[in-house]
Amino acid sequence: MILFMGGTEDHAVTSFQKYYPESVHIITSDKYAEKYETLLDQWSGEYNFRRGVVSFVEDLFESTGVNSLVGAFYEALHHEMENGHERTAPPQLAVGITGGTMHMAVTGTYLAQLAGGFVFYVLRP
């Protein structure tokens, strides 16, 4: 699971309870990176998933922001390939677009389709 996250984290827990991910990676802005490093440690123990990476984008509101989001997404995928379990078929990739900015949601949707995953949005935590 890859979650695009902004300042509010409640929807992340709803995502874990609905999809029971093997692992979780978070993409956020530099403003929230430290917060999600701590929360991902806590959540991985509480919800029994493998802790992934917290990738952050420093140029979120600049013209290069989308390129940085793409790089962060592929950093998470690469980490998953290097550290995930060996299997005969890849797991279904869930990409959460509830948090963050509109261009994070659009980029996440596009990348989920390219990677063969599915996109979800949490209406209410």
Enumerate the language-model features and the residues they cover.
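Short glycine-rich anion-binding loops that position phosphate/pyrophosphate groups of nucleotides
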Residues: 7-8, 99-101
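Long, low-complexity, Lys/Arg-enriched
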Residues: 1-92, 106-125
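Conformationally flexible catalytic loops at phosphate/diphosphate-handling active centers
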Residues: 95
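Short histidine/acidic/glycine/proline-rich micro-motifs that form metal-
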Residues: 30, 98-99
